[in-house]
């Protein structure tokens, strides 16, 4: 048993609190009168509180401060890479070994298991005097120790009190191995963020020193955690990000959907959380822009959407001579493959390699029928379900709508095609339809043969999903080379701004109306040889991801899209 030296403090209102033995050699005597910082008079009484030393089972998982998991062992395990082990001293004086699932630098790992845990972790950082907040915190701690010692065993026979520190906030009750990590966790309830970035014009604040350290790397560009895969050169700011990335190589999907009958699993808890909202219908993030009000299932999609209104593109390619800007980090991350020939992602079924995980996922869906989820695909599938439910609720039968099918997968990644351009190809590999890039830098291009083969209108859906662009039937003479203006048509039939379609051989001036494409962020919906292709761009996702979403929806059942035909077509 470990003795914790405490003094009871009887406040002037008759209540009792606890303070730790004074620091800096100062003695507190029985019956001594002290004055707290708020002017309250208190009286000192000596007490001793017994606290059980923490016990750990061999192989018990522990949570690191960056949120990743490790495992604790009494002795080193045979077959473990020495670089994945780290020796720590437990509170009882014994030595244990922390095993990380992936190798990380030991000097940058902050463990949830610490060598010494004292009440100073809960006191104010200023050692001089006692603040009212410190007395309250110490009172809570003393009652917590006494309470945890009386916690009964649960149904599995595991003593919950072994982890010692339980969150007292209503509806939470999470347990932690150290007082320090309980304190860090409680900041999620209080909103306290004591660690502030001192970079000019930043000022962001964080609940932990590790969070601040990871954030500073966004300013410095430091990425100390490198992927151990031989053909992969990626590096990351945190060990948690590296751990998530490694799962793209191993195929590990540890986070399962809790809904009965679903059975899907995911590489990260955040993707699972977004997926669960497709079951519940929750959309907690709402756009504050007047007349918009769109809701989103994830904070990432919400922030990316807001940048549509602000025009902000904060992510810049640092490769000399490039300088392209993007509204979201994932687009910049995927853009980097344009500057490298590395293809680190391998299909576990056929062995084909790809530069991007999204391209690999599209290949798996098309070639092998395997479904993988991303935040964006879950968002789009949810919206598709909502549209289908709304159509089913209509009393009158819906108008005839063309069926949608996917022509073919992207057969090959070509080095001369920018990463953000998705191409639909024929079986012989010849390009059939080229799609606009996410940043709008490349125009929509259709060959005369494609236009002649159109059996119905082509529709383009705006970012808001409320308007469609309709090209009239082939008798409108769109098969000729040049530029043709068509009109954006809203759901109620109101004509909005014109958009220019570029056919083969046309040269477009920088100040032409094709510039509107750069702001509309549209995806191409086309028909060819009687078969419809449908790709809708949602929430600033890339066209490649949009194709993934459409393919997944088609494989789950018949998917249709209602097209709006313009009366005049121009």
UniProtKB/Swiss-Prot annotation:
Q: Main localization of the protein?
A: nucleus
Keyword field contains Transcription regulation: yes
Q: Region entry Disordered: which residue ranges? A: 365-401
Q: Which terms does the record give in the GO molecular function aspect?
A: DNA-binding transcription activator activity, RNA polymerase II-specific; DNA-binding transcription factor activity, RNA polymerase II-specific; RNA polymerase II cis-regulatory region sequence-specific DNA binding; sequence-specific DNA binding; sequence-specific double-stranded DNA binding; zinc ion binding
> Where do the zinc-finger regions (C2H2-type) map?
165-189, 195-219, 225-249, 255-279, 285-309, 315-339, 345-368
- The domain of life for this entry's organism is Eukaryota
- Ranges for the region named 3 X 12 AA approximate repeats are 34-99
User: Entry's SMART domains?
Assistant: ZnF_C2H2 (SM00355)
Q: Which GO cellular component does the record give, naming just one?
A: nucleus
Task: Reply yes or no: does the keyword Kinase apply.
Answer: no
Q: In which tissues is it expressed?
A: Testis.
Record cross-link Glycyl lysine isopeptide (Lys-Gly) (interchain with G-Cter in SUMO2), residues: 24
Instruction: Write out the ranges of the repeats annotated as sequence.
Output: 34-45, 62-73, 88-99
Q: Where in the cell is it found?
A: Nucleus
What family name appears in the similarity comment? Answer: Belongs to the krueppel C2H2-type zinc-finger protein family.
Q: What does this protein do?
A: May be involved in transcriptional regulation.
**Under which name does UniProt file this protein?**
Zinc finger protein 76
Q: What is the lineage of its organism?
A: Eukaryota, Metazoa, Chordata, Craniata, Vertebrata
């Amino acid at each position: 048993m470990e003795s914790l030296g405490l003094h009871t403090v009887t406040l002037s209102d008759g209540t009792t609190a606890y303070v730790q033995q004074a620091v800096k050699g100062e003695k507190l005597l029985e019956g001594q009168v002290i004055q707290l910082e708020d002017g309250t008079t208190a009286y000192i009484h000596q007490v001793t509180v017994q606290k059980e030393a923490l016990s750990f089972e061999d192989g018990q998982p522990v949570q690191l401060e960056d949120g990743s998991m490790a495992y604790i062992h009494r002795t080193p395990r045979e077959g473990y890479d020495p670089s994945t082990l780290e020796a720590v001293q437990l509170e009882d004086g014994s030595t244990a070994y922390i095993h990380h699932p992936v190798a990380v630098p030991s000097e940058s790992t902050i463990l949830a298991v610490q060598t010494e845990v004292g009440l100073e972790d809960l006191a104010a950082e200023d050692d001089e005097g006692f603040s009212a907040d410190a007395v309250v915190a110490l009172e809570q701690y003393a009652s917590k120790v006494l309470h945890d010692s009386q916690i009964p065993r649960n149904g599995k026979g595991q003593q919950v009190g072994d982890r010692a520190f339980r969150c007292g906030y209503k509806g939470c009750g999470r347990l932690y191995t150290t007082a320090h990590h309980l304190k860090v966790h409680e900041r999620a309830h209080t909103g306290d963020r004591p660690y502030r970035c001192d970079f000019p014009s930043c000022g962001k604040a964080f609940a932990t020193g590790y969070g601040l350290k990871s954030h500073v790397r966004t300013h410095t560009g430091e990425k100390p955690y490198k992927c151990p895969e031989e053909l992969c050169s990626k590096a990351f700011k945190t060990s948690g990000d590296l751990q998530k990335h490694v799962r793209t190589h191993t195929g590990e999907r540890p986070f399962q959907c809790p809904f009965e009958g679903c059975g899907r699993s995911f590489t990260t808890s955040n993707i699972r959380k977004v997926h669960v909202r497709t079951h519940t219908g929750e959309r907690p993030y709402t756009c504050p822009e007047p007349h918009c009000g769109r809701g989103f299932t994830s904070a990432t999609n919400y922030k990316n959407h807001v940048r549509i209104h602000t025009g902000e593109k904060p992510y810049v390619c640092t490769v000399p001579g490039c300088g392209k800007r993007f509204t979201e980090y994932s687009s910049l991350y995927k853009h980097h493959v344009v500057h490298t020939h590395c293809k680190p992602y391998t299909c576990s079924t056929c062995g084909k390699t790809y530069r991007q995980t999204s391209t690999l996922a599209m290949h798996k869906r098309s070639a092998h029928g395997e479904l993988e989820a991303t935040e964006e695909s879950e968002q789009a599938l949810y919206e598709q379900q909502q549209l289908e439910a709304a159509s089913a609720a209509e009393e009158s039968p819906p108008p005839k709508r063309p069926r949608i099918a996917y022509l073919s997968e992207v057969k090959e990644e070509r080095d001369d095609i920018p990463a953000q351009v998705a191409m639909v190809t024929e079986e012989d590999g010849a390009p059939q339809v080229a799609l606009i890039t996410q940043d709008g830098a490349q125009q929509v291009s259709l060959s005369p043969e494609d236009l002649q083969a159109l059996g119905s209108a082509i529709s383009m859906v705006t970012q808001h999903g409320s308007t469609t662009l309709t090209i009239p039937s082939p008798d409108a003479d769109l098969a000729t080379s040049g530029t043709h203006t068509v009109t954006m048509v809203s759901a109620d039939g109101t004509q909005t701004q014109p958009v220019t379609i570029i056919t083969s051989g046309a040269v477009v001036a920088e100040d032409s109306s094709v510039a509107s494409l750069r702001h509309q962020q549209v995806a191409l919906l086309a028909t060819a040889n009687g078969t419809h292709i449908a790709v809708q761009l949602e929430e600033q996702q890339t066209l490649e991801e949009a194709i993934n979403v459409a393919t997944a929806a088609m494989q789950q059942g018949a998917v249709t899209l209602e097209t709006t035909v313009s009366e005049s077509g121009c």
